[in-house]
C-alpha cells in the first residue's frame, strides 16, 4: 500500500495451494499420475488458521530481503540504461494445472478449470495479462491431496513444468490455508517450487462458502507476480510498495464497507477492501490498481521474462 506511512508487515506468503482435479480434458494436453501415499493422514478442510487465509511468506525479514534484491536489480538495469518504460507490459502466461485427489475427493471437471481460467482472464485482462491453459494433469496421492502444504516439495518436484514465465497451479488441501504462492525472486534459488497452490473447493461454484468464485487463485497469482497484501506493513511508510493502495492497518474480512483503519491527513482513502490482495469475500474483491499493475510489470521483467 503506498500511501504515506505503512510499516513492513508480518503475515506469511510462501507458496499457493489448492486442489484442482480435472475429470476430463478436451483439446488440451493431459496426463495422469498415480502415486500411493504410505499413510492417509486426513485433515479436516479447514481454510484458515486464526486470521491467516493466505500462506504466502510475508514476514518482515522475507519482504526486506526481497526488496533489497529488487533494489540491486533495478540498479543494474539503470546502469545498462534501461528504464521502467522498457518493462514488460503484459503478455500471455501458459498455465500448467495440476489436479490432486485422494481417489474420492478433489475431483474437478474440465469445465471447473475452464471457469477458473476465465476468472483469471477477467481479473488481469485490464492490465494486459492473459492466461492460456497449456495442460491439465491428475495425480492420485492421499498424502499430497490432504496436506499439499506440508508435502509441497515432493509434490512440486514431481509435477512442476515450464519456465519462470509459466504458471503452475496445484489444487488440493493446502493445510490450514485457502492458498499460497511463491514470489518471483525465489525462482532463481528454487525453480521447481515456483507456483501457486489453492484449495480445490475455492474454484468457481466450489463448496467453500464465500470463497468459491475463483478469487483465491486471483489473489495468489498476484503474489506470483510480486504483489504483497494491501495491509502489508500496516499504517507505516512503505507498506505494500505500491503508491496508490490506501494504507490498511490489518486484513479485512467479509466485506466491511466504509472500513478505515489508518486515519488522519497522512492516510487518505478508505481501506482497499475491494482489492484482490486483501482478505475479503470473493464477492467483495474486484480490482487491482494502476500502481499494482506497474509493480507486476516490473517484477515480471526483473525475475521472469526470458528466464
Give residue spans per PLM region.
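Propeptide-to-catalytic entry region of secreted or membrane-anchored zinc metalloproteases
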Residues: 25-167, 171-175, 301-306
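Second-shell loop/turn segments in exported
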Residues: 100-109, 206-211, 283-284
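Solvent-exposed, acidic/flexible segments
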Residues: 106-113, 210-215, 270, 289, ...
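Short glycine/proline-enriched loop/turn "hinge" motifs that connect secondary-structure elements
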Residues: 85-90, 188-190, 267-270
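Positively charged n-region of N-terminal signal peptides that target proteins for export
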Residues: 1-5
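Metalloprotease/metallohydrolase-associated module, dominated by Zn2+-dependent proteases
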Residues: 244-307
Amino acid at each position: 500500500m503506498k500511501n504515506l506511512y505503512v510499516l513492513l508487515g508480518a503475515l506469511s506468503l510462501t507458496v499457493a495451494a489448492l486442489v484442482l482435479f480435472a475429470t476430463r480434458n478436451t483439446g488440451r494436453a493431459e496426463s495422469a499420475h498415480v502415486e500411493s501415499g504410505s499413510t492417509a493422514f486426513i485433515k479436516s478442510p479447514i481454510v484458515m488458521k486464526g486470521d491467516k487465509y493466505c500462506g504466502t511468506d510475508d514476514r518482515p525479514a522475507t519482504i526486506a530481503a526481497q526488496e533489497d534484491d529488487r533494489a540491486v536489480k533495478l540498479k543494474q538495469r539503470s546502469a545498462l540504461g534501461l528504464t521502467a518504460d522498457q518493462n514488460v507490459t503484459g503478455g500471455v502466461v501458459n498455465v500448467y494445472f495440476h489436479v490432486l485427489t485422494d481417489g474420492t475427493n478433489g475431483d474437478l471437471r474440465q469445465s471447473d478449470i475452464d471457469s477458473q481460467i476465465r476468472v483469471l482472464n477477467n481479473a488481469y485482462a485490464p492490465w494486459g495479462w492473459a492466461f492460456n491453459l497449456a495442460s491439465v494433469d491428475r495425480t492420485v496421492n492421499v498424502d499430497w491431496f490432504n496436506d499439499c502444504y506440508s508435502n509441497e516439495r515432493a509434490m512440486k518436484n514431481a509435477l512442476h513444468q515450464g519456465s519462470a514465465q509459466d504458471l503452475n497451479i496445484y489444487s488440493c488441501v493446502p493445510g490450514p490455508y485457502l492458498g499460497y504462492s511463491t514470489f518471483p525472486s525465489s525462482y532463481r534459488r528454487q525453480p521447481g517450487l515456483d507456483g501457486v497452490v489453492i484449495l480445490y473447493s475455492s474454484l468457481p461454484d466450489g463448496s467453500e462458502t464465500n470463497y468459491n468464485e475463483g478469487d483465491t487463485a486471483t489473489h495468489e497469482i498476484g503474489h506470483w507476480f510480486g504483489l504483497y497484501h494491501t495491509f502489508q506493513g500496516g499504517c507505516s511508510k512503505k507498506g505494500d510498495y505500491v503508491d496508490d493502495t490506501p494504507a490498511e492497518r490489518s486484513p479485512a474480512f467479509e466485506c466491511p464497507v466504509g472500513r478505515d483503519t489508518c486515519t488522519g491527513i497522512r492516510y487518505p482513502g478508505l481501506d482497499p477492501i475491494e482489492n484482490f490482495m486483501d482478505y475479503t469475500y470473493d464477492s467483495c474483491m474486484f480490482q487491482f490498481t494502476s500502481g499494482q499493475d506497474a509493480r507486476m510489470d516490473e517484477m515480471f521483467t526483473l525475475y521472469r521474462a526470458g528466464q
